[in-house]
UniProtKB/Swiss-Prot annotation:
The gene is hemC. It comes from Pseudomonas putida (strain GB-1). Keywords: Porphyrin biosynthesis, Transferase. Tetrapolymerization of the monopyrrole PBG into the hydroxymethylbilane pre-uroporphyrinogen in several discrete steps. One of its GO terms (molecular function) is hydroxymethylbilane synthase activity. The modification S-(dipyrrolylmethanemethyl)cysteine is found at C242. GO terms for biological process: protoporphyrinogen IX biosynthetic process. This is Porphobilinogen deaminase. Its EC number is 2.5.1.61. Binds 1 dipyrromethane group covalently. Belongs to the HMBS family. The porphobilinogen subunits are added to the dipyrromethane group. Its cofactor is dipyrromethane. GO terms for cellular component: cytoplasm. It catalyses: 4 porphobilinogen + H2O = hydroxymethylbilane + 4 NH4(+).
Length: 313
């Protein structure tokens, strides 16, 4: 294989740059002499910080500009947080690598209280996620959920300024940015089921670029990929973007996948849950099966209501 340059399209946020640098280091380690450069870009989701994500159209909000760079040959690969990646790709692009997953759990962050259970009634909790909101209010309907957007630093600064009693963030982002000491406690997946793909990094590239596919192969983590494939299949079957109250999480038990799924009203009034097991070779079928279970329980009505409130189909 000829030595060549790989250009990585990435968002400019600290977490996105960390992910791109991580992929850069892994590629350089796997292929000595390979030149890897970053092409930082600003996505629509990075520009629109004054509105809830669900109201500005969640699907592809953080990836479209990166995909355009791939299609225009301004970059060779795009590095994404898997929970932000839409279910369908533009013609000519595809997902060709999923890296090993970091901690997939949600993190409880507070300067005053040790855990979610310790929060007094009426406490203000910040999150930008309807998925987290639904599960939080189902457990603690006495809490006030307030809108929280911005990068990790901005969110922590708002907490430190006293705007919130606690905030909920993805543990993976805090760990990757060196803020592990800010995690007051992690919330178990039983209490807050993660978003599909949470904690995993995916790499998108041109479908015809087989040389790039080969360079990415050493970074692919099959165990993570099978879990994420099941989660994404559930999301796709429910027509879910990254900003709807859908949660799903798969674990490997030997050669079996166990997938749990959840759809909840943002008010926490109703939480629908389903789970199933299947061989890891049937990850996609498993995702559809659990999604069908949720639909049979009434998930479609909940999701239609959420999409209607957000003002998009």
């Amino acid at each position: 294989m000829s030595t060549r340059e790989i250009r990585i399209a990435t968002r400019k946020s600290a977490l996105a740059l960390w992910q791109a640098e991580y992929v850069k280091a892994r590629l350089e380690q796997a292929h000595p002499g390979l030149l890897v450069t970053l092409v930082p870009m600003v996505s629509r989701g990075d520009k629109l910080l004054d509105a809830p994500l669900a109201k500005i159209g969640g699907k592809g909000l953080f990836v479209k500009e990166l995909e355009t760079a791939l299609l225009d040959n301004e970059a060779d690969i795009a590095v994404h947080s898997m929970k932000d990646v839409p279910m369908d790709f533009p013609e000519g692009l595809g997902l060709y690598c999923i890296c090993e997953r970091e901690d997939p759990r949600d993190a409880f962050v507070s300067n005053t209280f040790d855990s979610l259970e310790a929060l007094p009634a009426g406490s203000i909790v910040g999150t930008s996620s309807l998925r987290r909101q639904a599960q939080l209010l189902a457990r603690r309907p006495d809490l006030q959920i307030r809108f929280l957007r911005g990068n990790v630093n901005t969110r922590l600064a708002k907490l430190d300024a006293g705007e919130y009693d606690a905030i909920i963030l993805a543990a993976a982002g805090l760990i990757r940015l060196g803020f592990e000491d800010r995690i007051t406690s992690t919330i178990s997946v039983d209490d807050s089921l993660p978003a599909g793909g949470q904690g995993a990094v995916g790499i998108e590239c041109r479908s015809a670029d087989v040389e790039i596919h080969a360079l990415l192969a050493p970074l692919h983590h099959a165990d993570t990929a099978d879990r994420v494939v099941a989660e994404r299949a559930l999301n796709k079957h429910l027509n879910g973007g990254c900003q709807v109250p859908i949660a799903c999480y798969a674990v490997l038990e030997g050669d079996q996948l166990w997938l749990r799924g959840l759809v909840g009203q943002p008010s926490g009034g109703t939480l629908l849950v389903a789970d199933a097991r299947a061989p890891r070779t049937a990850a996609e079928t498993l995702g559809v099966q659990v999604a069908e279970d949720l639909l049979s329980q009434g998930a479609e009505a909940i999701l239609k209501e959420v999409y209607g409130e957000a003002g998009h189909p």
